[in-house]
Amino acid sequence: MKVSVNWLRDYLPIELPANELAEKISRTTVEIEGQYQPQANMKNIVIAKVLSVVPHPDSDHMVITQVDAGEDEPIQIVTGAPNVAEGQTVILAKHNSIVGGGQKIKKGKLRGEVSNGMLTALQELGFDDKVAPKDFEEGIWVFNDVDAADLTPGEDALHVLGMDDDVLETGITPNRADLFSMNGTAWEVAAILSEEPTLPTFELTETSEKTADLISATAPAELAPKYALRVVKNVEVKDSPLWLQRRLWTMGIRPISNVVDVTNLMLLTYGQPLHAFDLDTLPSKNIAVRTAKPAEKIKTLDGVEREASEGDIVIAAGDEALMFAGVMGGELTEVTAKTTNIVLEGAIFEPKAIRHAARDQNLHSEASTRFERGVNVEDTFTALDHAAALIAEIAGGDVTEGRVVAQDFDYEAPVVKVTTAHVNHVLGTEITDAEISAIFDRLFFDYELNDGEFTVTVPARRWDITIEADLVEEIARLYGYDNLPATLPTGETTPGKLTPKQALIRATRHDLEGLGLNQAISYVLTTPEKANNFQLHDGQPIQLDYPMSQDRQQTRGSLLTGLLDDVAYNVARKQADVALYEQGRVFVSNGDANQLPAEIEHVAGVITGNVLPRTWAEGAQKADFFALKGIVERLLANYALADDVRFVPTTARAEMHPGRTADIYVGETLIGFIGQVHPLTAKAYKVNETYAFELNLDAIFDLPKVKDGYEVVSRFPAVARDLAILVDRDVPAADLRGAIVAAGGELLHDVELFDVYTGENVADDKKSLAYALTFVDVEKTLVDEDINAAVENITAALADQFNAEIR
């Protein structure tokens, strides 16, 4: 926010130079992001009165003027300004003057006629186009007759325009929205300087005509906890007096008209946005605060017709929506030069709805910013009354009797306690009760002190203070951060290390990268259609109240949705061979709004295209189920899980291929799944044949692990035997391997499947599998009797469990 130091001086006796004041504010309150004087380096610019205007003899668009600039003789100026006229009071940049941007103005000739300077527009003095009044966009600045009567030719124009003011640009933090007003800033500077601010006062004179006879209003408390209207009749809408325009443009706001400018002045003074309606153009005299109807449209003050969204708060008259509440007014009831009767609105609106409407309509205004961050609830009606009084004063209006109040509430000031002992414990100081009392006095906080405990009643203007820590902060910053004693950290130092879960996550990433997968990081938020895909957990995704886009509305329930988007991105750019993994959290809610959602650590991976490229020796190896299964098995082996890993075929996962998908169990615990992405799902994500897995790392972390140890390497030779069996075609190889391991006894060291055969000499409903069995004894050399006994146990178990035939 821009802060005028001259305006602050109306509140406080500030003797400090602006740069020292800025330093104190930065050290105590908020950062001063910039400091400047609008007149920067400009000089020799004065008030002048146009004495005569004659056409230029050699130009159809320029004129020759004689102006009184307070010197002995008139000064001749040649100008092309279309709005120059005799009798006007204007701004003159004299010979050897410097205007905005460092441009020097010198005496010269224009089409043969001498010009001793330049009549200037505000933009030529450095005014932004967004601040300069619209009436003078195409010409020079002309003072109105009322203001001109108080000006003297030759007077310093930069001073008259308020350009010798010092302006501070404050970086207001979210918790200090009270500084979005000059009153709030004055209270803060008063505390810094140990002064008492003198806030603006006003006198309101009302007519006998009652406001309630002219207008009515309704407002639900959940949309507008405060809402009131006032009526001012018989106003004359015209340019504001110079003092008011000067205040506005110094603060970066364009003057529009006396009525609108007063509402903007109240916004700057109190931090309370107000709005003015043309009473005579209201479709109905019944004003209502409500939410927008489906497809309801409003033509706003910028001339754009906008469609309101569900949940937007609108102000309606009868059945017609007039404006987006707290964001921007409507063209239908705009105050214009023809307006004679106005309705003033003062309100507090629900902040979330204002934020949603401002973002949805891309209408971030000074008003919406303040409603979003909060306003002083005790100033709403004060600002409304002050605006009515000032409009009556400068626009000649009559204020009708009373406010029409649709909604109000009694504010209960929060009471917060803090002890001197606690303050000193937190800050490491030895501050006394008297010093803390002095700080609360500087802040103008009411308090009671009882045996070292302060009971503080927080004023409404400081709604950021709600807990003990807030009071400690107030004490610290006004005591002076530089005055806090410097102390070294106490306590024993400990070596930094990863927690067990962090170590597991880091090892997972390392292993997957070693197995050929590249890490991807995708968005946590996704579409409602994708949020439920590939879910490993029962629960619901979480819907954002105000999503930033249609593609980022809900939290993900699986990492695979983002990974498939990443695959699609790569495939669309001619990168067909993709192997990616992501480690991150998924979010699961049980539907209870009073409980936080579960955040569960997962890891997922996808492969598509070729996992190995073509070489001179052999062709490319295409991605398939078994390539990915090998990656997952290696990863799980590195976790040293105490129980066996099982891959159980499943058809229950709708997004996965029903014949090429398996759930992954460790013991009886489901930890994930693996398989081919269903062709229809792949088509929806715009990817080719893709294989994927997802694991629950939190579940894996909680599983029992094998303790670190070592296995003796036998110095005796191993013995290998091959075993070929014939079984039904639907018997899983993993089940056969499990039976072999269980029946093989302690001597069986390793089992490897090395051949699967179907075809000639094998029945259509059968398949032949060949296993390589390795036997080892660490204590002696194996003999045939030992091995034969183990093989007989294995063949008997296979025949018994699977009706297997030994080939």
Please report, for each region that a protein language model flagged, where it lies by residue.
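Extended, well-folded interaction surfaces typified by the phenylalanyl-tRNA synthetase beta subunit core
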Residues: 416, 420, 424-576, 774-776, ...
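Glycine/proline-enriched, intrinsically flexible loops and inter-domain linkers
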Residues: 5, 55, 63, 198-296, ...
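Beta-rich nucleic-acid/ligand-interaction surfaces
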Residues: 40-43, 206, 493, 498, ...
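Conserved mixed alpha/beta core segments that line enzyme active sites in large multi-domain catalysts
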Residues: 47-78, 257, 266-334
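Phosphate-backbone binding interfaces of nucleic-acid-interacting proteins
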Residues: 1-203, 376-377, 383
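A carboxyl-terminal module marker
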Residues: 2, 27, 442-445, 612, ...
